[in-house]
Amino acid sequence: MTNLVLQLRRIAGIEVVANRAARRVVMVAAFALLTALSAYVAVPIPGTQVPVTLQTLVVVLAGALLGPGLGAASQVTYLAAGMLGAPVFSGGAAGIAWLLGPTGGYLLAFPVAAVVAGALAGRSGANRIVATVRLGLALAAGAAVILVGGASQLAIITGDAGAAIALGVAPFLVGEVVKLAVAVVIAARLRNRTLELV
């Protein structure tokens, strides 16, 4: 009887590990897909080649809801799909060349932004207000990483840092604040549940 119980526990433990690994793969793939879908919600901004998308919201949520490692993995998966030819970038674009253009710096910053948002968000604490403020600051830091990455590449392409900030950061600030507010609400509600899953 004891051997049977030990064998069942061992089998159940293996099953739990397998289920956890499967959940992680599914969550990484789901956030890669959400990032791709959010690229199709693109609003052009006059005077700049970079549209407003919902991608920032999804990227920082990936970090906050999956944690830094899996959040980054979801964004690396997204970028790999685009580099391999899947039409996942804004407007259905694909290919490595897209990462070398005006939007490439933003895209390449996605995995780093997910790590920053996930790492700074940490675990929820007992004080809900403090945890929500911390979450908001973590998501804002992740969004800032994306803007800095985008502006940096624009500065390299244009040779003008001032123009890069004027065209690659300033037009997006109001939209980023709105997206971050939505992201904080979503993350505050789902964070504990998703972190338990992965």
What are the language-model segments listed below?
Residues 1-8, 83-88, 158-163:
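Peri-membrane helix termini and adjoining interfacial loops of integral membrane proteins
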Residues 2-72:
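Hydrophobic transmembrane alpha-helices
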Residues 3-17, 37, 96-148:
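Short helix-perturbing small/polar motifs within transmembrane alpha-helices
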Residues 20-28, 52-59, 71, 102, ...:
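Residue-level signature of transmembrane alpha-helical entry/exit and packing/kink sites
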Residues 30-38, 59, 63, 74-82, ...:
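Alpha-helical transmembrane segments in multi-pass membrane proteins
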Residues 42-116:
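Alpha-helical membrane segments and adjacent membrane-interface helices in multi-pass membrane proteins
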Residues 48, 123-198:
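Membrane-embedded alpha-helical hairpins and interfacial helices in multi-pass inner-membrane proteins
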Residues 65-69, 116-124, 189-193:
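Structural signal for the C-terminal ends of transmembrane alpha-helices
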